[in-house]
Amino acid sequence: MTTKPSHQSALIETNVRWLRQALRLVGSLDDTAYATTPRGLSPHRAGAHLRHILEFYRCFLEGLESSHVDYDARRRDDTIEYSRDAASAAIRSIIRTLETSRDLHQERIIWVRMEDADSDAVREGFMESSISRELQVLSSHTVHHFALIAITLRTHGVELDSDFGMAPSTLRYLASKTAEAA
């Protein structure tokens, strides 16, 4: 299985860019906005969504050596959920690994488990995937949770860039609609 190195590098860079955005966001928040559930949005906290994002990255990176990534084996580390310092440290560590891991540049088949269905057949096995496919999954998953973080933070009255939590394809679509209207 091969992927052009430039494509693989672009996927890594995209994920690093999302994580740097998360790092800037965490640095801009106070503890209340980061760790408190807005009224009526339980259990949604910015910190809980960020913890979830980071645990997916950890599962992916930790599973590369064995070629078995188990997204269901998340640690659910509450420290990251409530501590901006712990979240920042985890983000920096993941960025470093993404930027330096040789495994990420060697496309190959990997096996992935993620329980998305209430079926014993799904729970028991791993599905075939690839490094580039999982990098794409991580990117999409991150943007999806950024959108939920944006809702949570805006409920707290936090000002965010209007494009925070929007997928690149959505931003391109909106830009094309704006260009058409002009």
Task: Write out the residue ranges for each language-model feature.
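Preference for long, well-ordered alpha-helical segments
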Residues: E134-L135, H141, H145-A179
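Helix-adjacent hinge/juxtasegments
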Residues: S67-R108
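Amphipathic, well-ordered alpha-helical segments in soluble domains
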Residues: W18-S28, F56, A90, H145-L148
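Alpha-helical scaffold segments that form or flank carboxylate-/histidine-based iron centers
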Residues: S6-L11, Y34-E55, A73-A89, E124-H141, ...
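Carboxylate-rich helix-loop segments that flank metal/cofactor sites and access channels
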Residues: D103-R123
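Extreme N-terminal tail/first-helix region
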Residues: M1-L23
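A short, structured beta-strand/loop element
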Residues: F56-G63
